[in-house]
Amino acid sequence: TPYDRRMKAPWSAEALRDEGPAHMVFLDSYLMDTYEVSNKDYGEFVTAKGHPAPAYWDDPRLNKPEQPVAGANWEDAKAFCEYRGKRLPPEAESEKAARGPKANLYPWGNEFDPAKANYGRNLEATMPVDSYPESVSFYGVYNMAGNVFEWVADWYDPRYYGRLETMVNPTGPAKPIWMGGTGTYV
């Protein structure tokens, strides 16, 4: 069924200039994986397709099977999704999955709580993909804030969301973007 809500941040001191103004977005129904892509799953793809391993693949802080893959670029993420018969979600789908029907600021609500996600620029390592069950989004998706960034299908344009019209299944502009991570690992 179609989904409508105000997408992106309202203009405020906290919002970045390219995150507004808020606007209405309609999305068709879609499915999203519950967890970030694990090193185990990504390793199967690397082996089966002969795909190059991503950055950090040999880093012992980041390469346990249950940890999310780190260092994959946009093309790697897209190729992995296609291998699994899936696709990268557009930013609007990822944002809906993270914020829920009330458009929360964080997957768990509107108050920042660093104990509910793997945050910080001095992280020693990523956490397993099923970490922080108390911060699972309304739609049941883990780690939509913190841990590693997630690539989306859209590309970046600082003026893209400056339009005020309603959007239906937006696909975004022309430079790749990621969402949700720690600021440390992609």
Model regions and ranges:
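Residues that act as N-cap/strand-start positions at coil-to-secondary-structure junctions
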Residues: R17-E19
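Well-ordered beta-strand positions in beta-sheet-rich domains
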Residues: A22-M24, S29
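Short capping motifs at secondary-structure boundaries
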Residues: Y30, V37, G43-P54, R84-G85
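Functional-site microenvironments in short loops/helix caps that host divalent-cation chemistry
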Residues: T1-A15, P52-V186
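Generic detection of long, well-ordered alpha-helical segments
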Residues: Y35-E36, A145
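Proline-centered helix-kink/hinge sites
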Residues: P21-A22, E36, P68, P89
